[in-house]
Amino acid sequence: MNAHEALAEIAGKMFGDNAKKVMMVLASNVEVSDEDLAKDLKMDPPELRKLLNDLFEARLVKYRRARDENIGWYKYYWRITDEPIQQILSDRKRLTLSILEKVLSLEENSETYVCPKCGTRYTVDEAENNNYTCEVCGEVLEPFDNTHRVEKLKRAIELLGNWDPSPKQQASRAIPHA
């Protein structure tokens, strides 16, 4: 699998099949305008632009803006990022670990309640403010045992912490799933 195919796979996992299709079209071109991409992929232009912006925020694509001399509006030309994939994956790993660790800390250090009927979760303060009844269905709230969630988060942190995005590691194993 080459770098462009790997980026397309990542985009697909993050944003769905349309993102993968966009990346594959970009991989076979130097630059493509969002208008041409929308036509090629038969996508709604606003939907495509949102997807391109999501891919840009994830650092998977780049763009160039040029003024159309005839109408004075800007046209955007998109291409696959030239940033090394290992750097993108390392940064994403670091960000994801940070988020998972914050969620773990919240789960370990806070008491929560759950509605046995609809499954809505509440913090202690929210439960107290609602007199321990569910805002959605009126059922009496029960303490929530989050032991399973805590263990799952710890396992995900361990797996991701041990994952190495370097090319030699990727050849031998896939991204771990928690």
Curated annotation (Swiss-Prot):
Q: Gene3D superfamilies this protein is in?
A: Winged helix-like DNA-binding domain superfamily/Winged helix DNA-binding domain (1.10.10.10)
Q: Where is the HTH TFE/IIEalpha-type domain?
A: 3-86
Per UniProt, which keywords does this protein have?
DNA-binding, Transcription, Transcription regulation
Q: Which InterPro entries match?
A: TF_E_archaea, TFE, TFIIE/TFIIEa_HTH, TFIIE_asu, TFIIEa/SarR/Rpc3_HTH_dom, WH-like_DNA-bd_sf, WH_DNA-bd_sf, Znf_TFIIB
Q: Which GO terms describe its molecular function?
A: DNA binding
Q: Which GO terms describe its biological process?
A: regulation of DNA-templated transcription; transcription initiation at RNA polymerase II promoter
**Domain of life of the organism encoding this protein:** Archaea
> For this UniProt entry, which segments traverse the membrane?
none
The written remark on domains in the entry is: The winged helix domain is involved in binding to DNA in the preinitiation complex.
Q: How does it assemble?
A: Monomer. Interaction with RNA polymerase subunits RpoF and RpoE is necessary for Tfe stimulatory transcription activity. Able to interact with Tbp and RNA polymerase in the absence of DNA promoter. Interacts both with the preinitiation and elongation complexes.
What does the UniProt record say this protein does?
Transcription factor that plays a role in the activation of archaeal genes transcribed by RNA polymerase. Facilitates transcription initiation by enhancing TATA-box recognition by TATA-box-binding protein (Tbp), and transcription factor B (Tfb) and RNA polymerase recruitment. Not absolutely required for transcription in vitro, but particularly important in cases where Tbp or Tfb function is not optimal. It dynamically alters the nucleic acid-binding properties of RNA polymerases by stabilizing the initiation complex and destabilizing elongation complexes.
Question: Record's family?
Answer: Belongs to the TFE family.
Q: What name does this protein carry? A: Transcription factor E
Species for this entry: Thermofilum pendens (strain DSM 2475 / Hrk 5)
As recorded in Swiss-Prot or TrEMBL, the protein's gene is named tfe
